[in-house]
Amino acid sequence: MRHPLVMGNWKLNGNKQMVNELIAGLRTELSGVDGCGVAIAPPVMYLEQAKHAISGSPVALGAQNVDVNLSGAFTGEVSADMLKDIGAQYIIIGHSERRTWHAESDDAIAKKFAVLKQTGLIPVLCIGETEAENEAGKTEEVCARQIDAVLNTQGADAFKGVVIAYEPVWAIGTGKSATPAQAQAVHKFIRDHIAKKDATVAAQVIIQYGGSVNDKNAAELFAQPDIDGALVGGASLKADAFAAIVKAAAAAKKA
């Protein structure tokens, strides 16, 4: 039985006041909600503050990136050991914005995946196709390639306890979203692709949907059998909007 996870990716947003106010709002909005895991990934500057603000709540701490190195002369980077030390659990890797703006390759992302696993942290591996790739009918090819960077080097066992986030690049922050049927088809493909190596592991992998998820489309998305929650961008910056998505995930999986 997979439990859904809804994770908020705050991206490059926030300040000290916002961290306190947003988390206070989440604590209120999510009171009594169960059946769905919740995590937030603030900017690294605010991880310590967020950790204290979520203390005693069901909200887990995440982060938006990690370096492949654990220490050394790597200016500006943050290591898996540092993230673990500060209390982060879910670490986003491979986000399309990192792939685009920082030219992160599939191989580099696979190395980050391995470092997180070795450190005992949970990778949230983002995969997904661009609009051009989607229009060219290459969605499955792209997703398979991005998964295979890990699968072919670390094996199916590496996906135990891991989160995959399918984020069609054309839907991120655009207001566009894949239809529930479109998203389900890709999620099923991802699960089936891993199942070729190990069906048991594939059955328990959490596969989130990301790409303009909001309180209006969440329930229909989460009703799909292979959609296990969401990686949420803009809507995660508002307590009521984010909580509505969490509640939709919890309700859908109880139905």
Swiss-Prot record:
The active site is at H95, E167. It is an enzyme of class 5 (isomerase). Pathway: Carbohydrate biosynthesis; gluconeogenesis; Carbohydrate degradation; glycolysis; D-glyceraldehyde 3-phosphate from glycerone phosphate: step 1/1. One of its GO terms (cellular component) is cytosol. InterPro entries: Aldolase_TIM (IPR013785), TIM_sf (IPR035990), TrioseP_Isoase_bac/euk (IPR022896), Triosephosphate_isomerase (IPR000652), Triosephosphate_isomerase_AS (IPR020861). Gene3D superfamilies: Aldolase class I. It is found in: Cytoplasm. It holds the Pfam family TIM. Homodimer. Involved in the gluconeogenesis. Catalyzes stereospecifically the conversion of dihydroxyacetone phosphate (DHAP) to D-glyceraldehyde-3-phosphate (G3P). This is Triosephosphate isomerase. It comes from Erwinia tasmaniensis (strain DSM 17950 / CFBP 7177 / CIP 109463 / NCPPB 4357 / Et1/99).
